[in-house]
Amino acid sequence: MSTTIIGFPRLGEFRELKFTTEKYFRKEISEEELLAAAKDLRAKHWNIVKEKGITEIPSNDFSHYDNFLDAAFLFNVVPASVQNLDLSDLERYFALGRGYQGEKGDVRALPMKKWFNTNYHYIVPKFEKDTQVKLAGHKIFDEFQEAKELGLNTRPVLVGPFTFLQLSDFEEGVKADDFVDSFVAAYQEVFAKLADLGATRIQLDEAALVKDLTAEEKALFLNLYNKLLADKKGLEVLFQTYFGDVRDVYADLVNLPVDAIGLDFVEGKKTLELVKGGFPADKTLYVGIVNGKNIWRNNYEKSLTVLEQIPAENIVLTSSCSLLHVPFTTANEEFEPALLNHFAFAVEKLDEIRDLDAIRNGQGSEALAANKELFATERVGENAELRARIAGLTDADYTRLPAFAEREAIQEEAFKLPALPTTTIGSFPQTKEVRAKRLAYRKGELSQKEYDAFLAETIDEWIKWQEDIDFDVLVHGEFERNDMVEYFGQNLSGYLFSKNGWVQSYGMRGVKPPIIWGDVTRLNPITVKWSSYAQSRTNKPVKGMLTGPVTILNWSFPREDISIKDSTLQIALAIKDEVLDLEAAGVKIIQIDEAALREKLPLRRSDWYEDYLDWAIPAFRLVHSTVAPDTQIHTHMCYSEFTDIIPAIDNMDADVISFEASRSNLEILDELKAKNFQTEVGPGVYDIHSPRVPNEGEIDNTIEAILAKVPSKKVWINPDCGLKTRGIPETKESLIRLVEAAKAAREKL
């Protein structure tokens, strides 16, 4: 009986880590109190995993901010600007993730990128010319010792050296090969220390191997591991992969002197085929059979069919990836049992892994019978009218006329905006008062009339403030919305909403993805009321703010009984109806956010178009294809790497696109120029995910850099994302500087 998981959620059952850490950020508790609370949380989580009967428990999967950042700190991959800050280790650690602005200095946060095809974001380390890779941290050892004191001999988890190098940035003139020997020495020192502490096995996460690999990348991988595994310091090595299959290196991988290999049998298209072709008898196979990214119950019969085909003798059942990507437990939900029985969050997935192992070993007949019964019953019916509407779509439904160049001229005449028009991405700070009023309204303590009056007053205040500082295109602030997906889902059929289904997105920020239960249609107008109200309060244009269909799908837990393409088209038709209602209400600039467009892009380039972009881009076009030429369509995208899909983004046929660029040093601009990008662009001129306020002249320099790459007539000036999570003082100070910088830049044109 051998079972494990790749990793466990770390925010806590009720987001305890988030709230404690935020108290620390506000200086309400000490560093010692934060560390003590985190220690208690780790003990609680280890105990849950143990009590569920999981036989191998991981450690060091916990993080105060991000596991990739933990590895950077462990191996001294820290910029000199942060190394030199006169701060504690923990303060420097947080400075890397959040930036630091205070009496000890002023440093920007490191860039942040999507973690493969998930909604989790990792902090991107940077190798500089003087970076000295060495063992500098002790977290992995401390947490192993903590668990040992609780009577648990855990398996420490660490990002592998290949993935670390592949996903990091490098200063000009610096390359990954420069650090092979120093990384090998540092990892071997980790091995030795863990062995001395009594560890028997370490898990090295090498998810980068599921992507397309060049000959040079394969050579780097083999060079690293041939050297590293030459001396394992008496420790067994589990080579763990997830998010896909390792077809490019499988033959090499099985011949490396590792002791165990973890493979993904959920998302790995070719994993079963590879293993059936042969797996070494002297190695243990960790079978990722329970989906770590979705919340539906595992179909035991289907999983057992896969397990029966695996020829390996030594098997450990595990999750397909870390359970970080699903909520904590269904125990705190209020769904009817008929609904709840279909869901498995992190704690319930422990049960599933244990059940499958028991069934495989001739036990667990009751669990198998109950699971069969669950899947034998039809879960939900279909909407025949909606299915017919989709079946009737033609190419014309995906094509906006006239073409972009003609629309651009029409809109220039219609809006008469200045050069370098200024705007924001949509949301303004959601203060304690805003959240308290929303909660009171939900509880029935505030009437509809009272709540509407509060929202109107708040919108009025921010519309006037935007006019006072002379923004060109305004937003209403989204004060009525709790979340950019849940708010829409609450007005769509086919959606369910958890009470406590939080999932970590970046740092201490959690999101609560809704669940797509059935067919999706719009129940009523969603945004028209407040967007049209805001427009009535000013003569300047106010953007209508919508979330696009691909993002709504990608930031929800999708159905598994129909394709994500079909689900997305259903959502697209619902949002299309909303776009047309906004236009009819006099809202002439409509932003359709596709923040998560890249999120489900297949990790292998050969699958990009056929499996995703060939339907995701048309789904966006479907939403806006029938608006008038003088209605301007904006879209926005968040932290992702877009440079390799620029033609697809241009093909969305929006009129303006804004995107994150500040943390990544505007690298995307070179690609826009090279690809002759036609859509007008708003590269984010400052990073809103850090509380840091841009220095005097900082935004001016960013605008200057943008104008060196993009014609001024194509450029908009905006922050890189919405301002919902920021405080009012820092928001206003930053936006005043943004408007001033835009005006100064206009003077130079």
Curated annotation (Swiss-Prot):
It comes from Streptococcus pneumoniae serotype 2 (strain D39 / NCTC 7466). Its cofactor is Zn(2+). The gene is metE. It catalyses: 5-methyltetrahydropteroyltri-L-glutamate + L-homocysteine = tetrahydropteroyltri-L-glutamate + L-methionine. Pfam families: Meth_synt_1, Meth_synt_2. Keywords: Amino-acid biosynthesis, Metal-binding, Methionine biosynthesis, Methyltransferase, Repeat, Transferase, Zinc. The keyword tRNA-binding does not apply. The active site is at H689. Disulfide bonds: none annotated. Belongs to the vitamin-B12 independent methionine synthase family. GO terms for biological process: methionine biosynthetic process; methylation. L-homocysteine binds at I425, G426, S427, E478, D593. Pathway: Amino-acid biosynthesis; L-methionine biosynthesis via de novo pathway; L-methionine from L-homocysteine (MetE route): step 1/1. L-methionine binds at I425, G426, S427, E478, D593. This is 5-methyltetrahydropteroyltriglutamate--homocysteine methyltransferase. Binds 1 zinc ion per subunit. It is an enzyme of class 2 (transferase). Its EC number is 2.1.1.14. The keyword Repeat applies. GO terms for molecular function: 5-methyltetrahydropteroyltriglutamate-homocysteine S-methyltransferase activity; zinc ion binding. InterPro entries: Cbl-indep_Met_Synth_N, Cobalamin-indep_Met_synthase, Met_Synth_C/arc, UROD/MetE-like_sf. Zn(2+) binds at H636, C638, E660, C721.
